[in-house]
Design a protein with these regions (language model features):
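Short coil-to-helix leader/linker segments, especially the first N-terminal amphipathic alpha-helix
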Residues: 12-13, 27-54, 125-133
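Structural recognition of the beta-strand scaffold that forms the well-ordered cores
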Residues: 61-73, 106-111, 148-153, 158-160, ...
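Histidine-centered active-site loop/cap adjacent to the catalytic His
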Residues: 307-358
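Extracellular glycan-recognition/adhesion modules and their associated mucin-like linkers
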Residues: 361-389, 407-434, 450-477, 492-494
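Serine-esterase "nucleophile elbow" of acetyl-processing enzymes
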Residues: 40-113, 170-171
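Secretory targeting and sorting signals
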Residues: 1-23
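Catalytic-core regions of hydrolytic enzymes
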Residues: 118-146
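Alpha-helical cap/lid subdomain in secreted, periplasmic
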Residues: 136-309, 313
């Protein structure tokens, strides 16, 4: 079953029945009889008759495939027949695919909560009796409409088993069993390495489905999107922090840090590799929810949620909505996808640059954006002390080691310096005190003047509001301070 939402467009004139040619003139291969019956029935709903039309005479469409991250799990409103008891796909009418600004007459959401690559690939298995293998849903949509974008979000339910790991981490917190990082970190990269070929195969199979439907590879966009982190360790910086139980950010704070700083970045690297190696367009959403995690301001993810009435009596399905994008999160996905489609980029990243709630697209993956700031005079690197990212964390010098608390990205539009730990913490002059000797800290990115810096010739970095002052490291492990610019090596960074 595929959820279809018509969002406008007039009925096209019928063409010859079966095998209609695509833009490049390639005829579609016939579907198996069972799928052809479904295709004809859906064509009749779309156009008033079951004929398969030439590509140029069809309604335009978008489709999403994958798992709970993109199906709408966590939104809370679900399509009939996908909210139990026999089908838990949890497809939401508020899912991202239905909310983009990409012009399309029809949007399809074939994604299903819990799906692994084996539920998507050609010849794969159905998740539920009333479901199709997702590649079969794509084959039908590709013949009834003119697909403009195919979105795939997959990998979490393969070797990674992200959901069970998350459940175990939360359970260990409730039962005082200790953190889960020591249990999972040693084998995490092996899990990532295992999922990469599965995602690559999935992309390849989707290409095959589209070619069999008569499409050339350039007739549509095939987008692979990575997963954002729903949790983070800085929740107590929220001035309205509700507490872990009321807010649903249950789990050890250090595990939330491991998830944000290690587990999700490794996963993102794997998804990116799969996208690049298979020739898909890649959207890096790994930092999209930074500053919008569970228990933060304007959260874009749902925290721990227990549905006591569906199912009843409660079972494992009662908590399946937990730690998934909420409606605002899907709105953020939709914005990023809209910008990506319009850009024509083959690889891009998306994030909220300054706590605006408005995602922005950048023409690179985040892996390539962050670099150390090495001081010419001391040879040490600018470092967020102790690997922390709480508001007020002191920034200073330390031996260069390549970890994420020494990675920095300069946003030329905002003129802000973001630490790699989180897109939501920027270098900050506390209180806008522009004076010699003033120390610098991390603070929630806001786009205000005390977070704006100018990278000048010669490697100096100066507050935009006080260009006579320079960031200075007086010693290899001294705090980073403002001092009058004097041209010394301690004020130059490479």
């Amino acid at each position: 079953m595929v959820c279809t939402v018509a969002v406008g467009g007039a009925s096209a004139a019928p063409g010859a029945a079966g095998g209609a040619a695509a833009a490049g003139g390639t005829a579609a291969k016939p579907l198996p009889a069972e799928l052809e019956k479904i295709r004809a029935r859906e064509a009749d709903r779309l156009y008033g008759d079951p004929a398969e039309r030439p590509l140029g005479e069809r309604k335009t469409s978008l489709i999403s495939l994958g798992d709970s991250e993109i199906s709408g799990e966590g939104v809370g409103t679900y399509e009939p027949g996908t909210d139990g008891p026999d089908n838990w796909c949890h497809r939401s009418p508020d899912a991202a695919i239905h909310r983009t600004g990409i012009g399309a007459d029809v949007t399809y959401n074939a994604a299903c909560s819990g799906a692994g690559s084996g539920n998507i690939v050609i010849g794969g298995s159905k998740q539920y009796a009333d479901e199709l293998v997702q590649s079969d849903s794509l084959a039908i949509a590709a013949r009834n409409t003119r697909l403009k974008m195919v979105l795939l979000v997959a990998g979490a339910n393969d070797d990674l088993q992200f959901g069970p790991v998350m459940t175990d981490c939360v359970t260990r917190w409730f039962l005082f069993q200790g953190t889960c990082e020591p249990k999972y970190q040693p084998g995490w990269q092996a899990r990532v390495d295992g999922l990469v070929p599965k995602v690559e195969r999935t992309v390849g199979d989707l290409r095959t489905v589209m070619r069999d439907a008569g499409y050339a590879d350039g007739d549509y966009r095939l987008v692979v999107m990575s997963y954002p982190s729903p949790i983070g360790p800085d929740v107590e910086d929220n001035p309205r922090y509700p507490g872990k139980l009321p807010g649903g950010c249950t789990g050890y704070t250090s595990d939330a840090g491991w998830g944000r700083n290690a587990a999700v970045p490794a996963f993102e690297n794997g998804v990116r590799k799969a996208a690049r190696d298979s020739g898909a367009t890649y959207l890096d959403a790994s930092r999209l929810f930074h500053g919008h995690e569970v228990c933060m301001e304007d959260t874009w993810a749902r925290g721990l949620y227990v549905n006591l009435t569906n199912p009843f009596p409660p079972n494992s399905n009662s908590v399946r909505q937990s730690f998934h994008p909420n409606a605002r999160g899907h709105g953020a996905f939709a914005s990023c996808l809209t910008q990506l489609y319009a850009s024509g980029l083959r690889e891009a990243a998306c994030a909220d640059p300054a706590s605006t709630g408005q995602p922005k697209l950048y023409p690179e993956a985040w892996d390539d954006a962050y670099r150390p700031l090495k001081n010419t005079g001391t040879g040490s690197c600018v470092d967020a002390t102790g690997g922390a990212s709480r508001n007020g964390t002191v920034v200073g010098g330390w031996d260069c080691h390549g970890q994420r608390n020494q990675g920095w990205w300069y946003d030329p539009e905002q003129r802000s310096l973001h630490v790699e730990l989180t897109q939501d913490r920027c270098l900050d002059v506390p209180g806008g005190r522009y004076a010699a000797g003033a120390g610098l800290v991390l603070w929630n990115c806001s786009g205000t003047d005390n977070q704006r810096f100018v990278r000048a010739d010669g490697g100096t970095i100066r507050p935009a509001a006080a260009p006579s002052l320079c960031l200075t490291l007086a010693g290899a492990k001294e705090p980073l301070r403002l001092q009058g610019c004097d041209g010394s090596a301690g004020q130059r960074f490479a």
